[in-house]
Amino acid sequence: MHLHFTPRQIVEKLDQYIIGQKDAKKAVAVALRNRYRRSKLAENLRDEIAPKNILMIGPTGVGKTEVARRMAKLVGAPFIKVEATKFTEVGYVGRDVESMVRDLVETSVRIVKEEMVVKVQDKAEEQANQRLVEILVPSPEKQSGFKNPLEMLFGGAQNSNQTSDTQEDVEIEKKRQDVERKLAAGLLEEEIVSIEVTEQQSSMFDMLQGTGMEQMGMNFQDALGSFMPKKTKKRKLSVKEARKLLTNEEAQRLIDMDEVTQEAVYRAEQLGIIFIDEIDKIAGKQSNSVDVSREGVQRDILPIVEGSNVATKYGSVKTDYILFVAAGAFHMSKPSDLIPELQGRFPIRVELTKLSTDDFVKILIEPDNALIKQYMALLATEGIEIEFSDEAIRKIAEIAYQVNQDTDNIGARRLHTIMEKLLEDLSFEASEITLEKITITPQYVEEKLATIAKNKDVSQFIL
């Protein structure tokens, strides 16, 4: 966990991936730092301080989800994103709101398990190599030297067998030492071996997914799993692939699942972040029977956000200290349309601004994972070096901004399809082009995207 970052450092880290939206970055940075501050308090005071949940308001594609996701990744906190529209009021068919907490705990278990596996990786690989040696040089089946029951009683023929067994064991040990040396030197990586691996069984309870009955299915499956033996099957693999599978199996045996569960539940409770998207879709006054469950979903979410105990297969989980970040465009409704009790549980409100042409220019070139860098890397695999002139980048940004203005504003996502359209012919012909270097100019951009920029009817089909 990396809770030691200062708010300024957190904002600087987020700036590497997200352009603009300073207010949102500051809000999440302070929320994260407050978790660190809370961890330093005396226990009696620590229990009194709950995180201040955040409501992000802004159109699609401006970075609401990305801010929360990058924040969680930065500190290694368990994080899940859910859509408010996927939940239904208790009593209706669909997912109940408590499933978001169960999903968070599952994510936390996965994170902790991966960390534990890394810690035991060396020992697991050592044991996997030992198993490979035993597979490559198997022990001979011991045959009984007794020919009749009387020899078992009086020990006849045993001494001669012991001598031959000892000689055979010495020879096998020599062979194994030789194989160990070759394995360490990487000389047997392509050798084919036959190993037994635990078979991954598809769950008969997968059909319950999305019905609100997943938890019941998982609990029943776990109960059955403790009685049913695990199935294994033989697979023929190269030593290199077999080592990966065997190392994973050994690592699973070495980690203590009770310790994993305990740490995972603690992290979910104290450090977990739940991002509730499209919360504006469940806001608004009930006007017809279709909207009947909107307020019901809000009232079901309320106790989770307020703080309650949710039953999971890993035990009861308290939601009092989970940070909730809700987001919505609020085109058709406004935050005040949420029920007052739920509004009060999101005291920090941040409005994200629409992206300008200058923002689009920065998005194209500045982030570590900038779009232009991605396309340059993709085409470089074909031996083609492409570069974009500053004027061409500005032209792309202007067209993306204009299409957003003329049609639906989908924010930075517009750049993805604009770039795809721009480089469509080049990507198609890349494997046949003999040129090693291509420069994208404003004229090239104009030629490829002119119809989109000028024709409103056409631009509606460019997402």
UniProtKB/Swiss-Prot annotation:
UniProt-listed CDD domains: RecA-like_HslU (cd19498)
One GO biological process term: proteolysis involved in protein catabolic process
Q: What is its main location?
A: cytoplasm
Q: Where is this protein found?
A: Cytoplasm
Q: Which InterPro entries does this UniProt record tie to the protein? A: AAA+_ATPase (IPR003593), ATP-dep_Clp_protease_ClpX (IPR050052), ATPase_AAA_core (IPR003959), Clp_ATPase_C (IPR019489), HslU (IPR004491), P-loop_NTPase (IPR027417)
| Entry's Gene Ontology molecular function annotations | ATP binding; ATP hydrolysis activity; peptidase activity; proteasome-activating activity
Q: Where does ATP bind?
A: I19, G61, V62, G63, K64, T65, E66, D277, E341, R413
Q: Which GO terms describe its cellular component?
A: HslUV protease complex
Protein family (similarity comment): Belongs to the ClpX chaperone family. HslU subfamily.
What is the protein name given in its UniProt record? ATP-dependent protease ATPase subunit HslU
**Originating gene:** hslU
